[in-house]
Amino acid sequence: MLGRKIPGSGVLGAGAGMDRGRTGERLHAALAGLQELHFLRDKQSAMVHWALTLNRDQPDPSKQENVSKEELRLEATLSLLKQQLTRLRRQDVGLKTHLQQLDQQITELKLDVCKASTEHLESDSRPSSGFYELSDGGSGSLSNSCTSVYSESLSSSSQTSLLPLLSTSYASHGRSSCGQTGVSRRCSADESTAQSDAPRSGVKLGSSLIRTATARADRARQRPVSTGDLDRMIGPGFGAFKSTDVKSSTPCSSPQNPSVDPKYQSNLVSSNGTEVYRYPSPLHAVALQSPIFSCTSDQGSSVALDEMPEEETQNLNEESTISSSVGYINKLLQRSSSRVNLLSSIKRIETVSGTHEQIPRSQEMIYGSLNGPQLLGSLQQLSMPLENALETGKTSALNNNQKQMDPPCLGSNFKEVEVQMLHHGKHPESSLDLQKNNFPINNTAGKVGAESDNGASEKRSGHFPKDLSVVQKPVERKSSFTSGREGSRASCHDKSSIPQSEFVHAQFVPAGSQRVKVRQADKKTKSVKLRKKSSEKPSAKKQHQKPLSREFCTKNRTDLKQSGSCRGKVTYLEESQAQSCSDCSCNGLINSHCIQNNHQQIPSSKSTKSRKAPEPVYHPLDHAKKKPSSRKWPSSSEIPLPPTLHTQRSKEMLNSRKVAMVRSVSARPRSGHWGCPPPRALPHSLSTSSYFSYLESRYPAAPVSSRHPPRCESEFSEYSAECASLFHSTIAASSDGEMSDYTTNRFGDSESSQGSQTASESDSSLSLDEEDLLEEEEEDEGGLVWAQAAMGTTAAGFSLQQHHRSESAACRIKASRALKKKIRRFQPASLKVMTLV
């Protein structure tokens, strides 16, 4: 009916013929798709049916197989038992002899141990190593351990001997699954377990654990199906589908569907190559029935349905992917090359139009943005010709100069510049600035290498000082960020030396004015008689010595202000003064004096001197001695002892002994109060101060009424003679110098305190004389020792103030036997020898 032509309509007949052909092709494609779907359905149903029958119908034959397998295992175990019995009989003979030898050795050892224990019971107390445990029978432990070790070796030997035998027995029965399949692959874990069940029972037998009932119970349970069984059993079932040709085994060969075009049994590939439908799949069948994949054979150029073999489709896919990747890479290369060309052209224009004014700014930019020496090394050769062109100002002849000097180097440099632009990535402008303005760095960093490489070194050597002077300004500006102190010192040197001299004088003034400042507080002191008596003799000396020190200070100041060539010396002195001031600043009072003298400087010291002229000089030491009587003891945290203090005080003691003065110069207790420990006990000064503070808290101070040192309240009690004899005997035997005077005066020995009364009356003046001698000796040394003298005087003043501040006015000691215990308990490290009687 469709093929019947309508009379009088030729055009319609031609169109109807074309439609008829198209519909016929669609129908054939739909038929092929339906047949493919039927084939897939049959294949899937066969797979499902096989899986169901595998789970349902297998138990009946498996029971029979299990029974036969159990019989075979029993036979194998019987044969193994026989073989093992023969081995055990052979091994028992050796075991018996070995055990007998061990028993003999154990008995011998036991006898030897018994003899040794009876003979050397008291002398030998070493712990035993634990190798021979003789506590539990002796012969039992070693024999048991030996049999256990031997049983383990026996079981291992039985394992190695039984495995090949079982494998041969299984091979003889024809139950080897690997041999059945004939596939040269390794057996899976389940196959190996299925074969090694009997050897495991043999192993159990080898280790004397024979179980026949449990083996049968294990065989009664069905082993689950695993991948090894599926691979072995499913392989032949599905091998028919895989091995047979799909085209020959399709239902198309049935008499109902005699003709099926083989072109519909190939893979479908779309025109753009993105979609591929493999033949035996439901998607392939559906795509055959759709009109999109219908074959338009009348239009030769446009073919919507491409029937190709698998190899051709794979090649087409590979070619499409390769072409797409190559096109993408080509696009990237074109973009990068165009960007590099554009940047290089801009770079050439900007390097021609660059001037000297851009150099300092670009120098800072380069310092901030340089990554490392690679950029310097790569742009070094390029920078020299550009720098020469900029120096001479002949911008028009830049290209000629570059070509004449080193054209290949320039070409390579431009390539390196392009590579660096690509390396910088998203910031080509910053890399352009680097490339444009890199010549100042290269002038400083790589000047020698660039001159040796290029030929016109004479011409450049004339221009280098200018560029270096231009470049050094930003370099100094940058170094001011990195090294701030050095830059500030350099700028101070360039400006003037006035602030340095003022700073030096401000640091130097506390050394001389500190005593003046302490002397100002003499009006508040109470012990006036002692101060007048003790200051009669040394006042003239001190007044004679003080103008010398003042002249020395003013002379140094004028020298520092006038001389401009000794700046390095001034800085060294400044550092030494700063060190001395920092050493003295650990004392709070001295630090406040330093701050005041920083602001007042010379006029303050003059005013204080004019204020104190009628009075005798240097009573502040006595004032400092009397002042701590009204305040509490400082704790150990309030008495810092810097290392310079130890050296200075030891130096004071050496100087005082050198002049043969009284030994209680600065460390022996003054009249009316007690001093710090002598310099020999400086490492233990913290412990002594804590000990004295403890005594002060236990026994409060008594008021001072005379210039004599206070004595114990219980001096005339019944135990005073005992205490005096105790301390005299210990001190005379174990101490010398200041230590004896200090301890006797400290613990209330009336005789020694009265004997040293004349010395203690003038000890203030002697301490001042000691300071004068120190200053004279240090001035004689010459050079830069005036700073050390300042440090010494401040340290000496600090030590004297520490003595008097850290001591109390009096200390009451109850003379009893508990005194010895307390002294022994709270004794400092320096008094251990004296109190341990």
Swiss-Prot record:
InterPro entries: Dapper (IPR024843). GO terms for biological process: mesoderm morphogenesis; negative regulation of nodal signaling pathway; Wnt signaling pathway. Residues 65-113 form a coiled coil. It comes from the Eukaryota. Its main location: cytoplasm. Pfam families: Dapper. Involved in regulation of intracellular signaling pathways during development. Specifically thought to play a role in canonical and/or non-canonical Wnt signaling pathways through interaction with DSH (Dishevelled) family proteins. Positive regulator of the Wnt signaling pathway which acts downstream of wnt1 indicative for non-canonical Wnt signaling. Also negatively regulates the Nodal signaling pathway, possibly by promoting the lysosomal degradation of Nodal receptors. Required for convergent extension movements in gastrulation. The C-terminal PDZ-binding motif may mediate interaction with the PDZ domains of DSH (Dishevelled) family proteins. This is Dapper homolog 2. It comes from Danio rerio (Zebrafish). The lineage of its organism: Eukaryota, Metazoa, Chordata, Craniata, Vertebrata. The gene is dact2.
